[in-house]
Amino acid sequence: MKEVTGSYNPRELEAGVQDTWKRENTYARVQEVRKDGKAFFFVDGPPYTTGHIHLGTAWNKIIKDTILRYHRMGGRNIIERAGYDMHGLPIEVKVEHQLGFTSKKDIEDYGIAAFIEQCRTFAVTHMEIMSEQFRQLGIWLDFDDPYQTIKAEYIESAWWAVQRAEERGLLERGHRVVNWCPRCETAIADSEVEYWDETDPSIFVKFPVTGRENEYLVIWTTTPWTLPANVAVAVSPAFTYARVAAKKDGSEEILWIADELVESVLKMGRYQDYTVLERVNGSDLVGTEYESPLAGQVPHQAEIRHRVVAADYVALENTGLVHIAPGHGWDDYLIGIQEGLEAFCPVDAGGCFTREAGAFADMYVRDANDLVIDALGDYLLARRTITHRYGHCWRCKTSIIYRATAQWFLKATEIREPMLQEIAKVKWYPEWAGSARFHDFVRDSRDWCISRQRYWGIPIPIWQCEQCGERTVIGTIAELEERSGARVPDPHRPYVDEVVIPCSCGGEMHRVADIFDVWFDSAVASWATLGFPREREAFDRLWPADFITEGQDQTRGWFYSQLGASTVAFGRAPYKSVLMHGFALDADGRKMSKSFGNVVTPEEVMNQFGVDVLRFYVLWANAPWDDLKFNWDSVKTIHRTLNILWNVYRFPLPYMVLDSFEPAAGDGGLWDGSFVRGNINDMPEEDRWIISRVNSLARTTAGDMQEYHLHRVTRALAAFILEDLSRWYVQLVRPRMWLEEDSPEKRYAYETVYYVMRRLVALLAPFTPHIAEEIYGNLRLAGDPESVHMLDWPEADDLLIAPDLESAMEVVRSFDDAVATARQNGRRKLRWPVAETVVVTGSDGVKTALEDLNDLALNRANSRTVRVVTGRWDRILWQAEPVMRAIGPEFGKEGPKVKALIEGADGTALKAAIERDGKAELGGYEIAERHVTFAEALPEGVFAAPMKDATVYVDVTLTPALEAEGYAREVIRRIQEMRRQLDLNVDDFIVAAVDVADDRVASLIAEEEWQKEIAGEVRAAALTVRRTDGERPTETFALEKDWDVEGVQMQIGISRAGE
């Protein structure tokens, strides 16, 4: 054990600890210690290797690391490979940007093989960057052998899963509407669509009813470009629709509009007058045929038999009639399936109209809005704009379209019920994340489109014969090599595209062009990280995962994709427990964005305050499942907390080193806390109390950690450090550290501080691994494990927990706060003693606590006596105050006289009479409780303050003896400050002189009693106290200072003895 002189410097401390971990290979050695423990299989949700980590990524990994460190200290053998998502559009778009590409054509021209290699290089480079950033956060995962979705063995895990889907009849080729990015020219998942406000046209259009002159169905849309694909109009059977004769500019039209919306629509169309001809139920309109207003521009529209259909989702807004284009909307597509409508989709992969769109061919669809509107001519009833939330590609930010295309699907709807049953078997943190949020999402989920029309991803392992149409799904690379007779060195595009499988018909099977949705990559992580299906041993022993945790958006992402793939492959969930955490936002609850200028990076926090502060802060700020609203002031609060921890740790070391203190060890030189257990009954109250408190802390944190209430644990730890340890126990025990002679009291103090710090650093280790390691490294005994992270999680020692003592100490702390307030009111500093402190209470608990801990109360109050009085204290007088709102109405003209009588009365006697009899006679008038209130009239020099269930009274009146002690304490404080300025060791003796410019004060502190007290406290081998008229003393000292001590001028000089 060494003395620590340096202040808390987190960056220097953490760099040193991480260097030690690296040099000593500490992580691997900790794993070795736990290798025989019960396995705990954790699957790391893989971040995309697209750049540097952000605050949300850091928070995510910190949560994971904290929980895994906790379980490791609980004896578990943690299986914890880091993982990285290294395929997909996130990587492709980054590489395209680097190469200056804007379209798939650019990639084709560049060469798929060359582009793939660029993607591979980018992904691996950024994986290494991110791994280093995670290491800097103190994250202990297996970064030397992470699972990588680009590896051949990982790709096989995905191939095997889709082969299982084929075997179970859960894989199909379908023509459906999907989210489509026209820039990336691929389908994208619902979870990959980002929404923000966008302004679009808002138009009302008249569709002419077949066979009825000047009669129209009025629809509304914000996507005019979808009108060339219109095939139907939907109405609600629950609504009433009006057939209206509307007049404008001398002509009349017959319009069909939802009855409640007639006036708003006609007003928008600037009609002057109207008459309702009839009202019908929506179901009566079903089957009505109409013509396309664009039949002249889009030839195919003339071939479609347009009609009205019923739909429950139609809302009573705009016109109450909805334009249906099954090729451009999911709900429309479902109606089309139900009604047998054509899914007409004259739009290509790049978002341009095809030749089937007639006059609009080759135009980008969203650019065509104005032309479509112009082509409507007189069929346009009204045109406005609307600002609404619209979907965009998550990677390139292009506005998406909905497009009917041929894709590969997993039939998630057929396994929906098994998935819901599996959700109920999983332990969710918090519970509602599974039972409500995730359950509802899965309940409403659609079949999963697993195909993408891109390059850098896991190739879908489906080979299809061009002649007979037969298809086969390959499960492993070995199977592919066997079936094809060709070697497959890299299962990526374009290499795997060249592999041909002979078909039984005599033809050739070629691989379909698509790659997997990147979400399917990570969906198989729980078995891919175990090497399955190549290797079975680890899978059979460990799968499914014991625990995973990711952000709340992963209910639509990774939580779901894993559940879907695993239910397809194994019929069960791939995880046993899931923690869902929130989003990292700014202080105002907004998403962090460069455009807002509100981004805070982990590096910013780490560089200013250190890794442990960042770690502790993000765990302390809120419950894991709530959003983190980052706040710099709170970060500073945590920095102060760890700084206080460091100072508490430093505080006893000089005394321990000076006294050659060796903590009592157990068998093999291992510290086991046995000294405290063996001597607890002989130890002072404050020692027994802090020992009880740290064990109570261990008990509560154990329960909270089981439920992953990380915020409760960190807040309890912070409160213990600040309130229990620093602001209370250290203040109580400090004088015992200064004792010159060896004594049981000093030994108890040393052993207690050591015991508490050893327990505390073990509790802190998962949260602040660096400072815990640093403190432990200096405190550990020869037989102790080499790292704090090799220790077992501290269990509460129930024999050392004293609930009654903890309750009593809370009373004393409340008393201490009240004394401080009363002294402040009386302008008497705590260093100055007072004659008497009285506590008036009706609480037996307060009375018992202050009597049992009276010595402690006396010391804290710096009072000659501390008395507890039940009832009333006889020195308290009462001042009577009239209540005029009661006196006026009852006494009328006599009111002023009654008022004067009450004000002049003996308030104490009047209060006693009313309390005794319910009334009192005063000058011939009957005074009741309603007529008067009473205020305390404290004796001169007595000041009061409330505490819980009591009132504290402090008499600050000074006597010569009290004044002498007060001045002596002031002198001691000044000399101690001067010792610090001279940087003296705690055991250095000094010589000192105190020259006082006041005869009376000089004579008070020159008394032998106080000279000895001062000399003893400041370790003065020689001390002179004398009267001075302001002249400088003739001696010279190493340090001389003038002080104003409560208005008295003093000159103090000190030097190290012997110099």
Curated annotation (Swiss-Prot):
Gene Ontology molecular function: any one: aminoacyl-tRNA deacylase activity
Subcellular location: Cytoplasm
Pfam families: Anticodon_1, DUF5915, tRNA-synt_1
Keywords: Aminoacyl-tRNA synthetase, ATP-binding, Cytoplasm, Ligase, Metal-binding, Nucleotide-binding, Protein biosynthesis, Zinc
Motif, 'HIGH' region: chain positions: 47-57
One cellular component (GO) term of this entry: cytoplasm
E.C. no: 6.1.1.5
Domain notes from UniProt: IleRS has two distinct active sites: one for aminoacylation and one for editing. The misactivated valine is translocated from the active site to the editing site, which sterically excludes the correctly activated isoleucine. The single editing site contains two valyl binding pockets, one specific for each substrate (Val-AMP or Val-tRNA(Ile)).
Family stated for the protein in its record: Belongs to the class-I aminoacyl-tRNA synthetase family. IleS type 2 subfamily.
Subunit field text: Monomer.
Official protein name in the record: Isoleucine--tRNA ligase
Chain's gene name: ileS
